[in-house]
Regions:
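N-terminal amphipathic alpha-helix/helix-capping segment at the start of soluble metabolic enzymes
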Residues: 1-19, 84-89
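Hydrophobic faces of well-ordered beta-strands that scaffold small-molecule active sites
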Residues: 18-22, 47-49, 95-99, 124-126, ...
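Catalytic cores of alpha/beta
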Residues: 29-39, 155-165, 207, 211-227
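Glycine-rich phosphate-binding active-site loops on the catalytic face of alpha/beta enzymes
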Residues: 44-55, 121-125, 130-133, 175-181, ...
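Active-site beta->alpha loop and helix N-cap motifs at the rims of alpha/beta catalytic domains
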Residues: 51-53, 62-127, 259
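Glycine/Thr-rich beta-alpha phosphate-binding loop at enzyme active sites
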Residues: 65, 73, 161-199, 236-238
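Catalytic beta/alpha-barrel core
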Residues: 72-75, 120-133, 147-155, 161, ...
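Alpha/beta catalytic cores of nucleotide-metabolism and tRNA/nucleoside-modifying enzymes
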Residues: 80, 195-203, 212-218, 222-261
Length: 261
């Protein structure tokens, strides 16, 4: 419900939702907590909590390096759940975990979603799980009140339609086919892409993969209900380390201000 409420609150005010991403444990759990609260305080509506993975195939070099750095620092899924539980004493902002299927399977599907429910995780995004295999975790996720959020790429009309009709939480609309990372320009026909989506679902849609700064976020927001910014934030954290929370706040505030112009 928190995800739905976050989008509805912005929509009621004629605004767009801002979703920001962070690699958990990069420079330690305390730095991650501070950065998450910086994003929340600067106006982020939903936080994507990235679970570091040794071979993140959907990610560009910035997130790959941050994942590696986090794992080398001793980050574990159990440690991330503990961190999330602590954060729940500070904020009700929706949290969405982004990870790969192996992370869930190794941990144990039932145990994983049980902890999601207990610690206050609102949704999961599993980027390399094909839409056709989504049922492998769907029943358990639903039983624990966790949204299984789908990604949709600018593919065939029929495929976009199928994914949109089945969406829950929000629909993660991939701006262009490839890996994450910042881009200078996009080549996708967004009018046609979002036209198919909006005809087939009333679930909010947010666009991500490649949004590098405030003006690009503003430009992309006209097509959908929210924008997702990840690599640009991860890059700031990589650059400033334990001193990053202030910079992350400033960058997120810049995104929020641009969306509200």
């Amino acid at each position: 419900m928190r995800i739905k409420e976050a989008f509805e609150k912005r929509k009621t005010n004629g605004q767009k939702a801002l979703i920001t991403y962070i690699v958990s444990g990069d420079f330690g759990y305390e730095t991650t907590k501070k950065n998450i609260m910086s994003m929340v305080n600067a106006g982020a509506d939903i936080i994507e909590i990235g679970i570091p993975f040794s071979d993140p195939i959907a990610e560009g070099i910035v997130i790959q390096e941050a994942s590696q750095h986090s794992l080398e620092g001793g980050t574990t899924l159990a440690g991330i759940f503990k961190m999330v539980k602590e954060l729940r004493n500070e904020t009700d902002t929706p949290f969405v975990m982004m990870m790969y299927p192996n992370t869930i399977y190794r941990f144990g599907t039932e145990r994983f979603f049980d902890l999601c429910n207990e610690c206050g995780i609102d949704g999961v995004i599993v980027p390399d799980m094909p839409f056709e295999e989504k049922d492998e975790i769907q029943e358990t996720a639903t039983a624990h009140g966790v949204d299984n959020i789908s990604l949709v790429t600018p593919a065939s009309h029929d495929r976009i339609e199928s994914i949109a009709k089945d969406a829950e939480g929000f629909l993660y609309c991939v701006s262009s086919i490839g890996v994450t990372g910042t881009r200078n320009e996009f080549t996708t026909d967004f009018d046609a892409f979002f036209d198919v989506i909006k005809k087939n679902t009333e679930i909010p849609c947010a666009v991500g993969f490649g949004i590098s700064g405030p003006q690009q976020a503003k430009k992309m927001s006209r097509y959908c209900d929210g924008v997702i910014v990840g690599s640009a934030i991860v890059k700031i954290i990589s650059e400033y380390g334990e001193d990053s929370p202030k910079k992350v706040y400033e960058f997120t505030k810049g995104l929020r201000d641009a969306l509200d112009e």
